Design a protein with these regions (language model features):
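Acidic, low-complexity, intrinsically disordered interaction modules
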Residues: 19-85
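Charge-rich, solvent-exposed alpha-helical interaction surfaces
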Residues: 4, 8-12, 16, 33, ...
Length: 89
């Protein structure tokens, strides 16, 4: 898989995580080029944000995203950390 696609997926996931952590006060903006790359290649990411999501191209699973959470509460909640993205080649 191309590195452009991998970077676009990571950018979108980081934006979702920042939005989940900080809500309306999040300062991370997803690049429109990342959204365009995913749309032009028919890449879809499920939107559960619980434990794991899947990445699909035309209905075929190409990878999964496993989310990690902080061990201790910060500001009354467990923050989401950087995800682990594994691709099936």
């Amino acid at each position: 898989m191309e590195t452009k696609i991998k970077k676009a997926i990571l950018d979108i996931v980081k934006g979702r995580i920042d939005r989940a952590n900080y809500g309306m006060c999040s300062k991370y903006f997803v690049c429109t080029s990342s959204l365009d790359i995913c749309e032009s290649n028919n890449i879809h990411i499920t939107k559960k944000l619980e434990y794991k999501d899947t990445i699909t191209i035309n209905g075929v699973v190409i990878g999964e995203i496993r989310y990690r959470y902080a061990e201790h509460k910060r500001n009354g909640m467990y923050k989401m950390l950087a995800p682990i993205i594994s691709y099936i080649d």
